[in-house]
């Protein structure tokens, strides 16, 4: 099967969030299936992590943007069994960051991803690769299914090509004004509410949902939420319900080669699920020393690795920290909303030895927080899948999470009885609700037998991509057969 994955980011090449982890890991896992040929398309950003020397594809080709033409070229590497093609255009992609600066989103993100979407299809023709399935990820690739069904509908090269569109987060919809629609090259006859029109403009996310042969999202529970709850569906719940026969949820997996406490080169001490106590204690002490926290083996250490965003519920955490800082240590890592960043900076400054905040995206530090923390706090308002709770369990760090989206699919909440629990649920989304759940967890933290059970259960759960990749493989075959 000839498979194309198209995304705006993929680990280890370029990353701002969980989308990158998913696309990179999925491509790698799919390439292990017999008979699959997998190509991953990415924009060629300035700061691409070159895991190997890039090879240049000779020649260039043109991409229409409105009434003008922009030039594209290709570079590629072989990454295991995956061919990774980078779409080059210095005007659009030679920038310090992927999507935005501290001042806001790049003003021409609409054009950047029109260019990327059309360039993926033109790249396939340029290198002579006829895909059976094009798997487009999130709004940045949402125009791909639409181009296949409209502009490229009569193109013989794509006669047998089908599309799958994966929604990673309904909150990010790629909304732009009508002037952007004109730049796309779609026909104005299709500018109606049933197709492209969206509140007088265009949504790249909606375009993917409308035109893809099949649509999925990244956990079964989130698939239910975004069709039934207008707060979760962000205005598109009706559209998703109309696709109920061609819509499903497939749980994301983890790259267990990257996230492996037994062989992780980024943590100071390794450990296994059957004997994690000494290794975790050593990682905790290392983290406390590293971040200037009081070195205390007995004091619970709560870790947070997250984007500073309203979705993540971190606006409620400073109040919680102020109440618990004398009996619990906190480590927070992440960037985003400037108001939240300032709040955590102030907390750390005023509570030296008790609270640490690191305002950057740091892969090495993230690994050390997952390994060195006792508890991982994830109070999301909504969470399509979430990888952090899976990583924390794999590292023997007990999660406290909201009962939403993929968190409900992956964490088994402890009720004081069940022997299969892996963490705790926040039953009421509020500062008080978080505090109640933290109190409940701290009660069992003192019970070493019970806490050891939670650690062991979490570390032994299988979060690998094997099962999820097989579900995608089966879905591809189903789509192609229609």
From Swiss-Prot:
Q: What top-level class of enzyme does the UniProt entry assign? A: transferase
A GO molecular function annotation here is: alpha-1,4-glucan glucosyltransferase (UDP-glucose donor) activity
Reactions performed catalytically: [(1->4)-alpha-D-glucosyl](n) + ADP-alpha-D-glucose = [(1->4)-alpha-D-glucosyl](n+1) + ADP + H(+)
**CDD domains in alphabetical order:** GT5_Glycogen_synthase_DULL1-like (cd03791)
| Keyword set, alphabetical order | Glycogen biosynthesis, Glycosyltransferase, Transferase
UniProt-listed Enzyme Commission number(s): 2.4.1.21
- Which positions does UniProt annotate for ADP-alpha-D-glucose binding? 15
Annotated InterPro entries: Glyco_trans_1 (IPR001296), GS/SS (IPR011835), Starch_synth_cat_dom (IPR013534)
Q: Does the keyword Glycosyltransferase apply?
A: yes
Pathway(s) where this gene product acts: Glycan biosynthesis; glycogen biosynthesis
Extract one GO BP annotation from the record.
glycogen biosynthetic process
Report the leader peptide range: none
Family annotation (PANTHER family):
ALPHA AMYLASE DOMAIN-CONTAINING PROTEIN, GRANULE-BOUND STARCH SYNTHASE 1, CHLOROPLASTIC/AMYLOPLASTIC
Entry's family note: Belongs to the glycosyltransferase 1 family. Bacterial/plant glycogen synthase subfamily.
Q: What does this protein do?
A: Synthesizes alpha-1,4-glucan chains using ADP-glucose.
Protein known as: Glycogen synthase
Q: Which organism is it from?
A: Elusimicrobium minutum (strain Pei191)
């Amino acid at each position: 099967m000839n498979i194309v994955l198209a995304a705006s980011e993929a680990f280890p090449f370029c990353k701002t969030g969980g989308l990158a982890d998913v696309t990179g890991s999925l491509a790698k896992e799919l390439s292990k299936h017999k008979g699959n040929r997998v190509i991953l398309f990415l924009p060629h950003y300035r700061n691409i992590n070159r895991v190997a020397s890039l090879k240049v594809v000779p020649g260039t080709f043109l991409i229409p943007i409105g009434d003008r033409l922009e030039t594209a070229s290709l570079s590629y590497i072989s990454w295991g069994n995956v061919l990774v093609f980078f779409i080059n255009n210095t005007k659009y992609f030679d920038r310090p960051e992927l999507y935005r600066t501290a001042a806001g989103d790049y003003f021409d993100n609409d054009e950047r991803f029109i260019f990327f979407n059309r360039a993926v299809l033109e790249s396939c023709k340029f290198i002579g690769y006829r895909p059976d399935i094009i798997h487009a990820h999130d709004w940045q690739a949402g125009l791909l299914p639409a181009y296949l069904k409209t502009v490229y509908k009569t193109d013989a090269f794509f006669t047998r090509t089908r599309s799958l569109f994966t929604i990673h987060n309904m909150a990010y919809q790629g909304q732009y004004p009508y002037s952007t629609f004109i730049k796309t090259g779609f026909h104005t006859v299709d500018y109606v509410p049933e197709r492209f029109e969206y509140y007088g403009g265009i949504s790249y996310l909606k375009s993917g949902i409308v035109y893809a042969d099949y649509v999925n999202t990244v956990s079964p529970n989130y698939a239910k939420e975004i069709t039934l709850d207008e707060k979760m569906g962000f205005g598109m719940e009706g559209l998703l319900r109309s696709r109920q026969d061609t819509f499903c949820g497939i749980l994301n997996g983890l790259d267990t080669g990257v996230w492996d406490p037994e062989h992780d080169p980024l943590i100071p001490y390794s450990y296994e699920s059957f004997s994690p106590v000494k290794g975790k204690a050593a990682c905790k002490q290392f983290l406390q020393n590293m971040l200037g926290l009081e070195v205390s083996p007995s004091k619970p250490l709560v870790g947070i690795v997250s984007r500073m965003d309203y979705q993540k519920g971190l606006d409620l955490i400073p109040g919680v920290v102020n109440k618990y800082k004398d009996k619990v240590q906190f480590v927070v890592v992440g960037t985003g909303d400037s108001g939240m960043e300032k709040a955590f900076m102030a907390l750390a400054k005023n509570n030296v030895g008790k609270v640490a905040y690191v305002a950057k995206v740091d892969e090495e530090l993230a690994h050390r927080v997952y390994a060195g923390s006792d508890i991982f706090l994830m109070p999301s308002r909504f969470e399509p899948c979430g990888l952090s709770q899976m990583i924390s369990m794999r590292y023997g760090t007990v999660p406290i999470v909201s009962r939403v989206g993929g968190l409900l699919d992956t964490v088994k909440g402890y009720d004081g009885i069940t022997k299969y629990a892996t963490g705790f649920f926040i039953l009421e989304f509020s500062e008080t609700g978080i505090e109640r759940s933290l109190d409940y967890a701290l009660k069992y933290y003192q019970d070493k037998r019970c806490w050891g059970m939670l650690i062991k259960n979490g570390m032994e759960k299988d979060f690998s991509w094997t099962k999820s990749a097989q579900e995608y493989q089966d879905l591809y075959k189903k789509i192609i057969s229609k």
